[in-house]
Structures are given as structure tokens and as C-alpha cells.
């Protein structure tokens, strides 16, 4: 699953300083179907950073609420959400090509016209391609928890990332995060409690029930049978 690159700005120049990469790019083997999808379907459903700032009406042929998911893995849940909510347009960002190929296959098999994907670094896409105040929802589901304390700095959910997401959400837009690591859930809540411009939809420092739009994964169901928890956080951008 794609994670973010935590970054800060140089206080003197204001330029972004890329510091700690929070994903490891391990290119898995492509299946024949995934390779064919990348070759034949990417021109129709793929988005490129070189295209510059996204023009949603040009891409989707309409102006509808837009949902962005960072790190969609193999794409089944994202495709399921797009199929279940045809009145919204969905954009995924994933750096691993097998996952992108798998999503493209889902798009074709399900005949989805409201789903597109980047295969790129999320921070650069957010900065260069996603207009400010343009997203109805940003989704981050089960990011790498980097459970060792010495690696916590690699976690995607950091103040700089939250501030960037806040810029991209429209007023009233939702940041939805989910994790199955309790320590990471606590870290997420700590960062969000300190973030400016957000309101916790469940109340101060409270976790939310899983909303209807987030599909329950097989992995999640197995974990629940073993007594493992899942924590959802829903925060709304204040106007």
C-alpha cells in the first residue's frame, strides 16, 4: 500500500524539504492480466502528473463530488466504493504497479466511468495536481503502521501531511482514516486533535464507527474474529 513522504518547509526559503520516505517501493511481479491492463487501459483511466493541475470536468465529463484515496492496495475496495456511489467521482493514488493494474482490470470488468488513478508519489500529486478546496473526502485506509518506535517518523499521518490534506478538502470535506494498530490509532488521534481547521465528527478525541461507505475487508473480518480491533477516524474541515 502506498504511503506518504513526510515533508516540512525550509523556514528561510519556504521550499518543501523532502526528508523521510514513508513507503518502500517493492515492485512485485505483474500478472499477465495486470500487465495487459497497464498497456491497454492506462491511456483511458490513468492520470499523469505531467498533465498538471487536474480539471475534473474534463476528466470525468461532469462536476460531481470527488473522493481521493491514498494507497488503495489492489484496488478492490476502491472499485467497490465507486460502483456503489455512481454520483461521486473517485481518484486513487498508488505507487505499486501491480495494484494499479489490478484496479484497471476492476474498472473495465465493472464498467466504471467514475474512477481514475495516478501511479505516482502521493505528495507530489497532491501538491502539483489536486486543486485546493476541491475534494469532498480524502481516504487513508490501513497505512503502514511502522510499529517500531524508531520508525514512527515514517508514518504518513504527521502534522505537515494533515495540513496539506486540509488545503485540498473543500469546506465540510471529510478526512477518513482507518487502522488496525491501536498505537497508530492513538497517534492519528493525537495529530488530529492538534490540527487546526478540523472537527471530530465523533466528538473530542473519540473514534467513529465504520461508516457505511467503507467496505469491510476479508483481512478485517479475520482480525475481528481473532479479537483484533479496527479504529476509524472521521474529521470534517471547518468552513
From Swiss-Prot:
Disulfide bonds: none annotated. GO terms for molecular function: tRNA (guanine(46)-N7)-methyltransferase activity. Transmembrane segments: none annotated. The active site is at residue 144. It comes from the Bacteria. S-adenosyl-L-methionine binds at residues 69, 94, 121, 144. Its EC number is 2.1.1.33. This is tRNA (guanine-N(7)-)-methyltransferase.
